[in-house]
Amino acid sequence: MPPLIALSPETSQALADRQPLVALESTIITHGMPYPQNLEVAQQVEAAVREEGAVPATIAVMGGRIRVGLDAEALEALASTPAEQVMKLSRADLAACLALGRTGATTVAATMICAHLAGIEVFATGGIGGVHRGAETSFDISADLQELAQSPVTVVAAGAKAILDLPKTLEVLETLGVPVIAFGQDQLPAFWSRESGLAAPLRMDDPAQIAASARLRRELGLSGGQLVVNPIPPEAEIPRAEMIPVVEQALSEAEAQGIAAKAVTPFLLQRIFELTQGRSLDANIALVLNNARLAARIAAAMAT
């Protein structure tokens, strides 16, 4: 194990015993919602993984090391740290955060890197980043997509966030050779909504099939991971027809106010929260829990 990796006793034991493990990101804790709700949701997500027979390993940079698996005290400390004091880490700034001794929350890309270093093959998140609308002029494309082509981790998400350009995101993933596997349906889900209007490139209905695909990719010497897109539970979704005008309104307001670059996503998510009267956050929590359960089932299939 690299010396920069600090495994929790539970994570270390799970790796030694070849128990199923699921990596969890920390950006949702530090930048996703306020304290103490963020702590409660993090605990619920970990509990969902355990209910399906796997061990959760939340990942963050704390005290100059990559912590893989946070105990109750560390989780509380991270959740209660103001967001402005926490670096939001991707591939580009992971090493810098460690060098500076800062606290850092891992995005999808950084979590994949850290999970792979620790020997964890499955990771559950809410949604991945992707190609932003207007990327043909801004070139704003999330590092998550490139990471999926590099780090051999199976990522379970509810699709890319619906504020993004989903057709272009799918095209980039195809170009990068990333398998996009819809779980249990033919359409690509769109985060808050079960349907996006786009056909998924691949479909699988059994976690064992997804685990087998990961193993065969390794045997074939193929680099990168897999993206498993898991639709939000029907009772929690905000239907696509309802979300389209909400997203369009938030996007037009962002453009009118000249909001650009890294400020765009937080602005859009906050406006969507307001326009849906909080339903978008409720849906977000439901889909993360759903993804954690599926990831645990995939991890269990990989461990057999």
Swiss-Prot record:
Enzyme active site: 25 (proton donor), 161 (nucleophile)
Cystine links in this protein are none
Please give the catalytic activity noted in the UniProt record: D-ribose 5-phosphate + uracil = psi-UMP + H2O
Q: Write down the top EC class of this protein.
A: lyase
Q: Which cofactor does it need?
A: Mn(2+)
- What are the GO MF terms of this UniProt record? hydrolase activity, acting on glycosyl bonds; metal ion binding; pseudouridylate synthase activity
UniProt entry tagged with the keyword Manganese: yes
HAMAP family in the cross-refs: PsiMP_glycosidase (MF_01876)
Q: What is this protein called?
A: Pseudouridine-5'-phosphate glycosidase
